A protein has these predicted regions:
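Well-formed, non-transmembrane alpha-helical positions, independent of function
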Residues: 26, 125-126
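Conserved acyl-CoA
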Residues: 98-112, 126-131
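C-terminal "cap" of GNAT-fold acetyltransferases
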Residues: 5, 11, 20, 113, ...
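A generic structural signal for beta-strand entry/edge sites
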Residues: 76-78, 111, 149
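Conserved functional loop/turn residues at catalytic and ligand-binding sites
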Residues: 83-85, 89-90, 94, 120, ...
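Acetyl-CoA-dependent GNAT
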Residues: 3-5, 9, 14-91, 97-106, ...
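A secondary-structure capping/hinge motif
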Residues: 134-136
C-alpha cells in the first residue's frame, strides 16, 4: 500500500477514536516499524495501559487502517504523554500534531510531561512548536540502543 493511496486529503478533518483491544496487534506492528532497536512496546504493555484506564486514541487512514496512535497517563495534577506514533507514509500532514493537541486537551490544566529521543528532530520540532520546553536529559534512556532522551514539559 503506497502513501498516496492512504494519505488523508489536505483539509480533511482528523477523526480520532478510542483504542480497543482488537487494535493492539496493529499497534505492536507499528511500534516495531517506528521504534526498531529501542524496545518497541509489546502487546502486554498496551494491554496494561488499557487495563489501567489510560487515555489512548487511534486514527485510521482513508482505507480504514490505523496510521496513528497516541496515549496519555493522567495522575493527580500531572499527565504524561506515553506515546505518539504515526505510520511513515502518514507523517508530515499534521496527524501527530492533532493527536498531541488532543492529549493536551484531555490533560486540561495539568502539567504535561514527555520523553523524546534527542535525535528525533521531527518530534522535537513538533513539541517545541506546541510550547514544550526541555527540562533535562536522560542518558542511555532507550534500550537496547542506549539513545538519550530529553525530558520535556508543558507548561514548564
Amino acid at each position: 500500500m503506497t502513501g498516496e493511496r492512504t494519505r488523508r486529503p489536505a483539509g480533511t478533518p482528523i477523526y480520532l477514536e478510542p483504542l480497543y483491544w482488537w487494535d493492539i496487534p496493529v499497534l505492536v506492528g507499528l511500534e516495531e516499524t517506528l521504534f526498531p532497536g529501542d524496545s518497541p512496546w509489546s502487546a502486554e504493555m498496551f494491554w496494561s495501559e488499557l487495563a489501567a484506564g489510560h487515555h489512548y486514541v487511534v486514527h485510521r487512514d482513508t482505507t480504514g487502517l490505523i496510521d496513528g496512535y497516541a496515549g496519555l497517563m493522567v495522575v493527580a495534577d500531572e499527565a504524561e504523554v506515553q506515546t505518539v506514533g504515526v505510520r511513515p507514509d502518514g507523517q508530515g500532514v499534521g496527524l501527530g500534531r492533532a493527536m498531541l493537541r488532543h492529549l493536551m486537551t484531555v490533560a486540561g490544566d495539568r502539567r504535561v510531561l514527555l520523553e523524546v529521543r534527542t535525535d528525533n528532530v521531527n518530534a522535537l520540532a513538533l513539541y517545541a512548536s506546541e510550547g514544550f520546553v526541555t527540562l533535562g536529559i536522560r542518558r542511555r534512556y532507550y534500550r537496547p540502543s542506549g539513545a538519550d532522551a530529553y525530558t520535556m514539559a508543558y507548561p514548564q
